[in-house]
């Protein structure tokens, strides 16, 4: 089957689309990446998404309209990846669309029950592409008592499980998450959970202090030094003390967190603040390894993915934090994969599993009561 996986993450970089060919289903699936592209959001759409993400500034009319606008954006992104690949849209069998997360409530909070909302109307995508769309992957896991995240572990087992090596797959997107993949001979469980911020706070600080959307290759962070009092403040966040399975998002590490941090520590230089929040991402990852993974698993390799793997300052901080742990550290490209395409490929794989009526959540990662088939299916008009 030819499937387009569509992902718009918490970093708001744009729409990632992976065109893949998949043979079979389940752990024996054969997955081939044909082409990958990122279609940037136009400024107006990005501004509307940012407004929709803000509890103070959002409204139901905006979210209702944006749901359909994003559906059209996602459809156009699918057309673009096919055009770039010189691939006929008519040959496409399926689209797996994650959607744009507007709010994610993984745990009960007063009268707010666990819930999640991703928008990007699948009916619009199906109509515009004349292709079956599978979307809303997180909701069934949450209905089964899970946190709806992380969902990539299933695809990571298919792509990365090794005959003899125990691997950690560390994604550094807006939020960071890790998947522990024991080797094929092991009887240990696959586990996965969010480790805290990825690029989200780094990008927010960059935008506010340097008027840049991100710190390219970590060049600015390389110029500063870590401020202990800021790092201590960051590392005291309650999320770091929680036991897995757990997930987090913009609600904990987004605009509000960055605003409070910058106000509290405004006396420090811009460069030092950026260096310190970069170290916070690295330290929060290392903290979770040492507390929840390394005491129980012997890890041979750590494989980094997501946009944060291109931040050489962040990667060097991670290497230093793990230098005594006797594990090799790679980025996706080192082993023949794409850091950028990883999550879009994952949702193509999940769409394929749903098409075959296979459960594809990992209860040991999400906390769900059982394995479930993920996603809603929207058929094209004819």
Curated annotation (Swiss-Prot):
Q: Which SUPFAM superfamilies match?
A: Actin-like ATPase domain (SSF53067)
| Name of one Pfam family that matches | AnmK
- Keyword Ribonucleoprotein included in the entry's annotation: no
What reaction(s) does this enzyme catalyze? 1,6-anhydro-N-acetyl-beta-muramate + ATP + H2O = N-acetyl-D-muramate 6-phosphate + ADP + H(+)
Q: In which pathway does it act?
A: Amino-sugar metabolism; 1,6-anhydro-N-acetylmuramate degradation; Cell wall biogenesis; peptidoglycan recycling
Q: EC number(s)?
A: 2.7.1.170
GO MF terms listed in the record are: ATP binding; kinase activity; phosphotransferase activity, alcohol group as acceptor
Write out the entry's keywords from A to Z: ATP-binding, Carbohydrate metabolism, Kinase, Nucleotide-binding, Transferase
Would the keyword ATP-binding be found if you checked this record's keyword annotation?
yes
Which domain of life does this protein belong to? Bacteria
* GO biological process, any: peptidoglycan turnover
Q: Which residues bind ATP?
A: 9-16
Tell me its family: Belongs to the anhydro-N-acetylmuramic acid kinase family.
Q: Name the job this protein performs.
A: Catalyzes the specific phosphorylation of 1,6-anhydro-N-acetylmuramic acid (anhMurNAc) with the simultaneous cleavage of the 1,6-anhydro ring, generating MurNAc-6-P. Is required for the utilization of anhMurNAc either imported from the medium or derived from its own cell wall murein, and thus plays a role in cell wall recycling.
Task: Report the protein name in the record.
Answer: Anhydro-N-acetylmuramic acid kinase
